[in-house]
């Protein structure tokens, strides 16, 4: 039977036999009939190929392909067998379930059983595996690389050994060093750089100062004081009232016309006479003759008596001013008096000198009542000198600055805004600036604009907006009481000036009603005002009514506390005992008091 099969195969595959003729066919029939061993079979198979030398490789590949196919068939059959076994196990497990009756009703139909399983898994929840977790092991694919691919694979895997190329019996320099080493050698061959410490740069040309910087330097620079010798300081302290510091009035000491100025001021005010000058000179001679003399501290009774005498002198001065107002009505005389009177205000940077006590001298002067916004210049008296000294050194009193008061007001305004959160319409209108923050009745639209308060930064209407003079210098350097009352009552002073002044025609009984305490407070308020010369650069700004009231209350309270603190400090200084020394100019050393010592 094998012979017949081989004969049929030879007819199919022997396509060259027809050309050779009947002789070849007879030879093949003989060879087929004469198959005895495997060698004959191999010869017949090799005869099928065009070249017999390729027969081993060709039939090896055929055998490998057949073997791979049989292995695939074997694995496929084993998978089918294992799947059947798994299905049988699943059927046995599902017989005890509730769904076994449903499967029996469906008569074990495959599609129905699979559908029920899918629905059950969907109800219970199915966890799908990712594609990467799947174990997919395909069969190895056989391929043959081209010579180029084989060479590239060897280069990638570095399966090679390079031979060094010799030039004249030595390796060329290009192959000795890498590119990085060549660059480093080139850098090293260059001349060395100079170190940074040895370099000398040209000085930068001075930049010209701008106008803004020059103005700021002028503002920050302190007022230059004229130098005064210690001899003149001691002589002036013996002549003038000892409670007043020399730094508050330098014009009476440094100039040679100082006795003349003192005499003129005393003639205008009717206070000092030639007798006071003689007493002052005799006291100076006694002080120079005696080296040191211990002064006894005054008792409380003496202090009370001196205060009562000062109050009586104030009563007399006010009564004389109301009784004879025609003395100052002459404008020429007023101009002369104001020209001869020394200014009361001096900057805080001036340093007061140590005080020395002398028996109090009574002075009677004619005073004129003026509104609070008009600056009053008077000759230096004992009480005014004390207030000026205390203005430079406020004792036991916290003076708030304009910046601090502005911050406090803004915080209070924010807290006041939070009260209207329950009223959403009012709150949103106030927050967006569409409603007046003071009266809360005037709404702003496209035609009615709002004014912004420069103190609390809130929009207000025209009726709630007032004018106020605020300093253009940094707020942190100015105390709050420097804003008033000339800054607060600027509009009121204009309206008062239009009305006829009735202060000169007041009866004596109306003046007597004022207490001495109120007069002293008003006088100290006038003394604490900023002079008009320093308020010229202040600009008029828009401030709301609430902020203006808030500022006025703070100013009044701060001034009241400042007056009380100064009064306590003055009484404390009166009860202290100290030495009066007449040392030479070389031994003289003026003592300075700091804020912490006070």
UniProtKB/Swiss-Prot annotation:
Compositional bias segments (type: Basic and acidic residues): 354-370
Q: CDD domains from the entry?
A: FYVE_SPIR1, WH2_Spire1-2_r3, WH2_Spire1_r2-like, WH2_Spire1_r4, WH2_Spire_1-2_r1
Coiled-coil stretches are none
Q: Where mainly located?
A: cytoplasm
In terms of InterPro entries, this protein maps to: KIND_dom, Spir-1_FYVE-rel_dom, Spire, Znf_FYVE_PHD
Q: Where is the composition biased (Low complexity)?
A: 316-327
Q: Where is the composition biased (Polar residues)?
A: 248-289
Q: Where is this region: Disordered?
A: 1-30, 194-213, 248-327, 341-379, 488-508
Q: Which residues carry this modification: Phosphoserine?
A: 229, 247, 305-306, 308, 520, 524, 577
Q: Does the keyword Phosphoprotein apply?
A: yes
Q: Which GO terms describe its biological process?
A: actin cytoskeleton organization; actin nucleation; behavioral fear response; cleavage furrow formation; dendritic spine development; establishment of meiotic spindle localization; formin-nucleated actin cable assembly; Golgi vesicle transport
Q: How does it sit in the membrane?
A: Peripheral membrane protein
Assigned GO CC terms = cell cortex; cleavage furrow; cytoplasmic vesicle membrane; cytoskeleton; cytosol; Golgi apparatus; perinuclear region of cytoplasm
Q: Show the domain comment.
A: Binds to actin monomers via the WH2 domain.
Q: Report quaternary structure and partners.
A: Interacts with FMN2.
- Which function does this protein serve? Acts as an actin nucleation factor, remains associated with the slow-growing pointed end of the new filament. Involved in intracellular vesicle transport along actin fibers, providing a novel link between actin cytoskeleton dynamics and intracellular transport. Required for asymmetric spindle positioning and asymmetric cell division during meiosis. Required for normal formation of the cleavage furrow and for polar body extrusion during female germ cell meiosis.
- What is the protein name for this chain? Protein spire homolog 1
Provenance organism = Mus musculus (Mouse)
Name the gene for this chain: Spire1
């Amino acid at each position: 039977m094998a012979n017949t099969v081989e004969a049929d195969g030879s007819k199919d595959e022997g396509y060259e036999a027809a050309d050779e003729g009947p002789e070849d066919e007879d030879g093949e029939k003989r060879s087929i009939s004469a198959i005895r061993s495997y060698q004959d079979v191999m010869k017949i198979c090799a005869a099928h190929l065009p070249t017999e030398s390729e027969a081993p490789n060709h039939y090896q590949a055929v055998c490998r392909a057949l073997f791979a196919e049989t292995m695939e068939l074997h694995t496929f059959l084993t998978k089918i067998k294992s799947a059947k076994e798994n299905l049988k196990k699943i059927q046995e497990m599902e017989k005890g379930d509730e769904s076994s009756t449903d499967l029996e009703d469906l008569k074990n139909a495959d599609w129905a059983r699979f559908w029920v399983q899918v629905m059950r898994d969907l109800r219970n929840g199915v966890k799908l595996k990712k594609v990467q977790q799947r174990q997919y092991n395909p069969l190895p694919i056989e391929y043959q690389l081209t010579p180029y691919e084989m060479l590239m694979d060897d280069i990638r895997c570095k399966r090679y050994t390079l031979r060094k190329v010799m030039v004249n019996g030595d390796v060329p320099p290009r192959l000795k060093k890498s590119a990085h080493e060549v660059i480093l050698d080139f850098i090293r061959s260059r001349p060395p750089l100079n170190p940074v410490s040895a370099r000398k740069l040209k000085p930068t040309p001075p930049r010209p100062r701008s106008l803004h910087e020059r103005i700021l330097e002028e503002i920050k620079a302190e007022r230059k004081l004229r130098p005064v010798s210690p001899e003149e300081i001691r002589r002036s302290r013996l002549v003038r009232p000892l409670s007043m510091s020399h730094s508050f009035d330098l014009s009476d000491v440094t100039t040679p016309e100082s006795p003349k100025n003192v005499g003129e001021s005393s003639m205008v005010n009717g206070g000092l006479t030639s007798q006071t000058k003689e007493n002052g000179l005799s006291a100076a001679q006694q002080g120079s003759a005696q080296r040191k003399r211990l002064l006894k501290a005054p008792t409380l009774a003496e202090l009370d008596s001196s205060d009562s005498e000062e109050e009586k002198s104030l009563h007399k001065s006010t009564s004389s001013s109301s009784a004879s107002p025609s003395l100052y009505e002459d404008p020429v005389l007023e101009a002369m008096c104001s020209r001869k009177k020394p200014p009361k205000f001096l900057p805080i940077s001036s340093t007061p000198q140590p005080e020395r006590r002398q028996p109090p001298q009574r002075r009677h002067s004619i005073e004129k009542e003026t509104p609070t916004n008009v600056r009053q210049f008077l000759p230096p008296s004992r009480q005014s000198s004390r207030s000026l000294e205390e203005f430079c050194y406020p004792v036991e009193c916290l003076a708030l600055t304009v910046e601090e008061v502005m911050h406090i007001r803004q915080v209070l305004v924010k807290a006041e805004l939070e009260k209207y959160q329950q009223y959403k319409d009012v709150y949103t209108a106030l927050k967006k600036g569409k409603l007046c923050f003071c009266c809360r009745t005037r709404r702003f639209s496209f035609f009615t604009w709002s004014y912004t308060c420069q103190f609390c930064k809130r929009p207000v209407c025209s009726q709630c907006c007032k004018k106020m003079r605020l300093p253009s210098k940094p707020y942190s350097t100015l105390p709050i009481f420097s804003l008033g009352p000339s800054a607060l009552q600027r509009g009121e002073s204009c309206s008062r000036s239009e009305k006829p002044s009735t202060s000169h025609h007041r009866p004596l009984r109306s003046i007597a009603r004022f207490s001495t305490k109120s007069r002293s407070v008003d006088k100290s308020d006038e003394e604490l005002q900023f002079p008009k010369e320093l308020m010229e650069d202040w600009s008029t700004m828009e401030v709301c009514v609430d902020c203006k009231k808030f500022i006025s209350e703070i100013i009044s309270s701060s001034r009241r506390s400042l007056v009380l603190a100064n009064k306590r400090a003055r009484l404390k200084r009166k009860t202290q005992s100290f030495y009066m020394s007449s040392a030479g100019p070389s031994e003289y050393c003026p003592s300075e008091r700091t804020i912490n010592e006070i």
